[in-house]
Swiss-Prot record:
Its cofactor is a divalent metal cation. Pfam families: PdxA (PF04166). This is Putative D-threonate 4-phosphate dehydrogenase. The keyword NAD applies. Catalyzes the NAD-dependent oxidation and subsequent decarboxylation of D-threonate 4-phosphate to produce dihydroxyacetone phosphate (DHAP). A divalent metal cation binds at H153, H197, H252. Binds 1 divalent metal cation per subunit. Keywords: Carbohydrate metabolism, Metal-binding, NAD, Oxidoreductase, Plasmid. Its EC number is 1.1.1.408. Gene3D superfamilies: Isopropylmalate Dehydrogenase (3.40.718.10). Substrate binds at H123, T124, K260, N269, R278.
Length: 321
């Protein structure tokens, strides 16, 4: 299995190119040799100039054509959306072929993506489609808090409908397997409720009793150390304080808000249950500051470090088999 990680530079008009260049510039020579950047060389060179850096880019870039590159920073366009898709598509194919061990994605713009005819709700849905996977889960990881989501980019109304026993159970299983993979021998998992105070015995909704509770019971029967549903207004604090290794959140904002509160610049977005490995920054394209050389690349550094751990784990498993 390849130890090379592949960074997709994201939307050419956003902060992705500059944070990618800055992260590459800070790498050791050995880490650079184990890195490929899927993007557009002219755009990356423009970002390098904006940053005032002198790092050599050409040896590490899989250079893909972008019409009119470099495009204006901070602009929304179908050209940029299509380019962002093609960067990811090429990286996925190389990952499937074993040429790279993990993909690290810089931010894309969903509106630009859809303008270009690529109708996905984000990276996770796109990767699920490109790999032909039936399921994929978004896990946000920080040093003291990790959260996996039952649903993500859907309306709150739809998210409630998606919190089925089957889907909650599948999310618990996926989270448990991932934590074991990264070194947790006996992961301790908490499942957040979806209603205030988990419905108060049906006073505020029955989903916790009828859908989420049975999923937790089934997971426990499988030997998974899981508790819940636990009221969402306390479960994240308990996990952050060391009581749990992972929280299963029922919908996007339930899981994202606590993570971004405690680890805004360092949290890593991980796609779980795909046939390939992928980590990502946990922020958007930030068009308002793109090209100004002020974007914080700490989040990307965290995603790169997590990817290298996953790649090292692949090598360890292969050696043991």
């Amino acid at each position: 299995m390849s130890k090379i990680i592949g960074i997709t530079m994201g939307d050419p008009c956003g902060v992705g190119p500059e944070i990618t260049v800055r992260s590459l510039a800070e790498m050791s020579a050995a880490d650079r040799e184990a890195t490929r950047i899927y993007g557009n060389l002219a755009t990356l060179e423009a970002a390098r100039e904006a940053l005032g850096l002198s790092v050599d880019l050409q040896p590490y870039v899989v250079d893909l054509t972008v019409e009119g590159a470099p495009l204006p920073w901070g602009s929304l366009s179908a050209v940029a959306g299509d380019a962002a898709f093609r960067f990811i598509e090429r990286a996925v194919r190389d990952a499937e072929a074993g040429n790279i061990g993990c993909i690290v994605t810089a931010p894309i713009n969903k509106e630009a993506l859809n303008m270009a005819g690529h109708h996905y709700d984000g990276h996770t849905g796109m990767l699920r489609s490109l790999t032909g996977s039936s399921a994929a889960y978004m896990l946000l990881a920080s040093e003291r808090l990790k959260v996996i989501h039952v649903s993500t980019h859907v309306s709150l109304k739809e998210a409630i409908g998606r919190a089925t026993t089957e889907r909650v159970l599948a999310t618990i299983r996926a989270g448990n397997a991932h934590l074991k993979r990264i070194g947790y021998e006996h992961p301790r998992i908490a499942v957040a409720g979806i209603n205030p105070h988990c419905g108060e015995n049906g006073l505020f909704g029955t989903e916790d009793d009828d859908q989420i509770g049975p999923a937790v019971a089934a997971a426990r029967e499988e030997g998974i150390d899981v508790q819940g549903p636990i009221s969402a207004d306390t479960v994240f604090h308990r996990a952050y304080s060391g009581g749990f290794d992972l929280v299963v959140a029922q919908y996007h904002d339930q899981g994202h808000i606590p993570i971004k509160l405690v680890a805004f610049d360092t949290a890593v977005n991980v796609s779980v249950d795909l046939p390939i490995d992928r980590t990502s920054v946990d922020h958007g394209t930030a068009f308002d500051i793109a090209g100004k050389g002020i974007a914080n690349h700490g989040n990307l550094n965290s995603a790169i470090a997590y990817a290298r751990k996953l790649v090292a784990g692949q090598a360890s498993r292969k050696a043991a088999s």
